[in-house]
């Protein structure tokens, strides 16, 4: 994701259209700093305490628009062709594939989706022609020791529903919005299979934020379309969104997901075992469907996820007196009572992942940093100043789990116990 500041998402029990228009614009700003699309020319990024790696020309990977999307009817929100960035693997990694799904929030109204369609989160007309591959996408063995020489793909996010919208939900009254996220996912995966992924011996599906949620929604589909003898696993980064009320007791995220699912026809893309038992929008929450995923999954998530704290727990509309204003922007500015509330959010996450903790094939790295999307920045993925739990970086932990070197169920102690944390500061 890429971001300076956040805007309000909720007003009382319903998010107003004006709120979502502002929020969608906020998502545009947020998505490209924390995802792999770091813009080195931008001067409007959050301040942090660590140095960032210099981007070299070899880090830049060109955009490719899908060659099969048009015939498949797979379009971005505005009707443009979806795209991806592909870096070919080499040597021992030539038959290994890492596919990453970009994040960038969601849109739940015609107004917010229309606004999104005028940005790179809804139209390939605004995509950068080159992006820097960092973190889990890096080809530098010092930054990405486990997967540096794999085939790596970054699929751009331009549908607004975690690659899960369906055309049946589109308007027939002349409103030009294309809800084709599911078709984009299927078309690009088929394209990658034709490029050699059908012969993969090892593969990982990853994603950040809304893309991290998508990596869970589509995990088994990914597994089922690769060779049966391939080692296929999924890694969700910052995609474990909680179904918890905001500080005023309003069902902020649940109401939002309800609107996303209904607007974009997401129900058929969700886990059908879950949908058969409960209201479909609840099946957007990983705690409701993670147990049904057959493919091994690794969760990377901060227990103090700043996106969720700023948008789910304490949206500005739930803070009318602005008593949370400083805390939301910088966790070091939170007072003792606010820290108690944040610890409560952490407790909710611990409860939500409790069942998954018993999954023998699953893995997790749950740190106590004020962060979001940690696999796509080299400084948080694997560097001298990366967050560590039990002296392991995220990259080392994912590697130990993927290659079956050891079980990995790492849960950090509560904030502020971890001095290695990379805490975002939006002031």
Curated annotation (Swiss-Prot):
EC number annotated for this UniProt entry: 3.1.1.-
Active site feature: 209, 305, 372
EC class: hydrolase
One GO term (biological process): cell wall organization
Compartments reported by the entry: Secreted, Cell wall
Function recorded in the entry: Hydrolyzes acetyl esters in homogalacturonan regions of pectin. In type I primary cell wall, galacturonic acid residues of pectin can be acetylated at the O-2 and O-3 positions. Decreasing the degree of acetylation of pectin gels in vitro alters their physical properties.
Record's protein name: Pectin acetylesterase 5
Originating organism: Arabidopsis thaliana (Mouse-ear cress)
Record lineage: Eukaryota, Viridiplantae, Streptophyta, Embryophyta, Tracheophyta
């Amino acid at each position: 994701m890429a971001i300076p500041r956040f805007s309000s998402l909720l007003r009382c029990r319903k998010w107003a259209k004006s709120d979502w228009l502002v929020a969608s614009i906020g998502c545009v700003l947020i998505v490209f700093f924390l995802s792999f699309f770091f813009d080195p020319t931008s001067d409007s990024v959050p301040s942090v305490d660590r140095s960032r790696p210099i981007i070299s020309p070899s880090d830049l990977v060109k955009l490719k628009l899908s060659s099969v999307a048009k015939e498949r009817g797979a379009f971005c929100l505005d009707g443009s062709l979806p795209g991806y960035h592909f870096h070919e693997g080499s040597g021992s990694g030539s038959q290994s594939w890492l596919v990453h799904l970009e994040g960038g929030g969601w849109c739940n109204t015609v107004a917010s989706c229309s606004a999104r369609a005028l940005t790179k989160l809804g139209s390939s007309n605004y995509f950068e022609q080159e992006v820097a591959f960092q973190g889990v996408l890096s080809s530098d063995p010092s930054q990405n020791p486990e997967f540096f020489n794999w085939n790596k793909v970054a699929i751009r996010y331009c549908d607004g529903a975690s690659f899960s919208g369906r055309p049946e939900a589109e308007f027939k009254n002349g409103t030009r919005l294309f809800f084709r996220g599911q078709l984009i996912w299927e078309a690009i995966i088929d394209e990658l299979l034709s490029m050699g992924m059908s012969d993969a011996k090892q593969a990982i599906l990853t994603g950040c934020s809304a893309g991290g949620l998508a990596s869970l929604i589509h995990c088994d589909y990914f597994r089922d379309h690769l060779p049966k003898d391939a080692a296929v696993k999924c890694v969700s980064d910052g995609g474990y969104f909680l179904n918890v009320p905001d500080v005023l007791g309003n069902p902020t995220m649940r109401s939002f997901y309800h609107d996303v699912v209904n607007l974009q026809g997401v129900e058929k893309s969700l886990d059908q075992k879950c949908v058969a038992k409960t209201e479909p929008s609840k099946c957007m929450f990983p705690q409701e469907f993670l147990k049904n995923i057959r493919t091994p999954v690794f969760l990377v998530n901060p227990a103090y996820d700043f996106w969720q704290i700023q948008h789910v727990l304490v949206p500005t509309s739930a803070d009318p007196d602005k008593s949370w204003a400083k805390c939301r922007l910088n966790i070091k500015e939170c007072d003792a009572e606010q820290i108690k509330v944040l610890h409560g959010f952490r407790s909710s996450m611990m409860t939500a992942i409790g069942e998954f903790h018993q999954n023998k094939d699953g893995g997790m790295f749950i740190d106590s940093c004020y962060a979001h999307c940690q696999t796509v920045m080299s400084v948080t993925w694997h560097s001298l100043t990366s967050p560590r739990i039990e002296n392991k970086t995220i990259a080392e932990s994912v590697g130990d789990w993927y290659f079956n070197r050891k079980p990995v169920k790492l849960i950090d102690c509560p904030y502020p116990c971890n001095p290695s944390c990379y805490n975002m500061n939006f002031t």
